[in-house]
Amino acid sequence: FLPLATSSVMWMRTTPIDPGQTVVILGQGIVGALCAQIVRERSPGSVITVDAQPLRCEISSKLGSDHVIDVSNTDSVKAVKELTNGKGADVVIECVGGNTGIRSFEQAQEMLAPEGVIHLISKYQGAPLPLDGDRFMNKQLIAGMRIDQPRERCMADAAEMLIDGRVRIFDLITHRLPWEQTPEAYHMLYEKPGEALGVILEWD
């Protein structure tokens, strides 16, 4: 988990977040779940997480998100607007990626508050990302990570967070399998995302 936690620290320190702002994290896979915990060091007013898998929503709730939106049965844009009294999110962090992430990016634009920021940290495939110029007036879009701190410093901070429990990883582990079942592990992750999140391969 340390490499992903390190990258998550760098991403969250790249994102321009002011204390008290509302942060929405789209996608609660491993990276999204790590970011939802690490972003707390930026003192947001509220952290809202969004996913389409009930299992991931349940885990996100256990990890302390202020609000969890299950988009399998809820309109995420409408829910975010309601939770922010119509304003929208100050910051939206897009962690879905892939083909599904294209629609998620559209929703990010719809739920973003005036002068808000969308931070893309996922990889996308298929069609180009749709950007609505009118909707994006007076807003910011950033991608990747730009940070003055060296990766080694962020890795040390990530390790400290894992050790002292500020970032909880054991809740992310849904399965432990012997290494001989590596193909089954990948099949589970790609074909049954509603049943698995973190799969650990064990060598005895």
Give residue ranges: language-model regions.
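Electropositive phosphate-/nucleotide-binding environments in soluble metabolic enzymes
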Residues: 1-6, 54, 74, 86, ...
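Mid-domain Rossmann-like dinucleotide-binding core that forms the NAD(H)/NADP(H) cofactor-binding site
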Residues: 1-74, 78
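Glycine-rich cofactor phosphate-binding loops and adjacent beta1-alpha1 units
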Residues: 15, 58, 63-141
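A local structural motif
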Residues: 44-45, 88, 166-171
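Residues in the short beta-alpha loop(s) of Rossmann-like NAD(P)-binding domains
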Residues: 52-53, 124, 147
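Conserved beta-strand scaffold positions in the cores of enzyme catalytic domains, especially
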Residues: 68, 141-143, 172, 176
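C-terminal hydrophobic helical "lid"/dimerization subdomain
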Residues: 102, 106-109, 114, 152-204
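Active-site PLP-lysine loop of aminotransferase-like
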Residues: 143-149
